[in-house]
Amino acid sequence: MEGNLWLYRLYFRVVILLWLPVSLSAVDLPNLTFRTITISDGLSNNIINTIYKDKRGFTWLGTQTGLDRFDGINVKSFLQFSGRTIFSIAETDSVYLWVGTDKGLWKLDRKTDQVELVTLDTKSLEVRSVFVSQTGRLLVGTTHGLFIYQESAFRKVLFGSNALSSINFITGIVEGYKDTFWLTSQGGLIEYNIETGQSKVYTYQDDEKFVSYFSCLALLKEKLYLGTAGSGMLVFDIGKAAFSICPEVENGYIKSIITVNDEIWVGTNGSGIRII
């Protein structure tokens, strides 16, 4: 699964797990080594929005005010991103790193450390999610729609004609099956077929609440685990096209969700991390 799903927004410090050759089961957790990294170690900010481990083994940290790289010993801050909020990180090859920020999409050449601002609609378009498919296709989720990189250019996809509508505020992307991608947005869960262009929007409603704002998502065994902005975590069964409430996380603002082996790790806004 793509590295940019490692989304933990931690306040005042970030804990980096220096992985040993063991699985992340409960019996193995005592064998993990933990190290705390803060601004005193060179981190650009103690608020971490995204963590991405690249194919060369470097850990990239997207913070509230910059981009950092951790090599296991030292932290290197990239001054080119100073003052920018980093939301998402991905790589398409061994050279280029794609960085989604509050001021647009940037491409970092890791050989030269040169950066390039990639124009989508406008240079200042906020990029919340950057995702690379299994075939190497780049998808970029922004506050004004989805952009797909193909044939050396970006193609814009809108869900509804109004780019400013909540459904086009994309917060997360995962890859499903048979050309299908699942996107979370402030206006619902989107099922999108990248080949046909067809899409369908799902929202949750019961006798007590209506939920359309989804903050993040993860896919595990034909089920989507969806973070919300105040209603905890919902589960969407793809085969049944039906929602259910996750009783372990019924309330709260979910900041991040990832899969670790067959477990779901949920990053909350102020209540730490829950493992399901």
Question: Which stretches of residues belong to each language-model region?
Answer:
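Carboxylate-rich, polar loop motifs that coordinate divalent cations or form catalytic acidic clusters
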Residues: 1-276
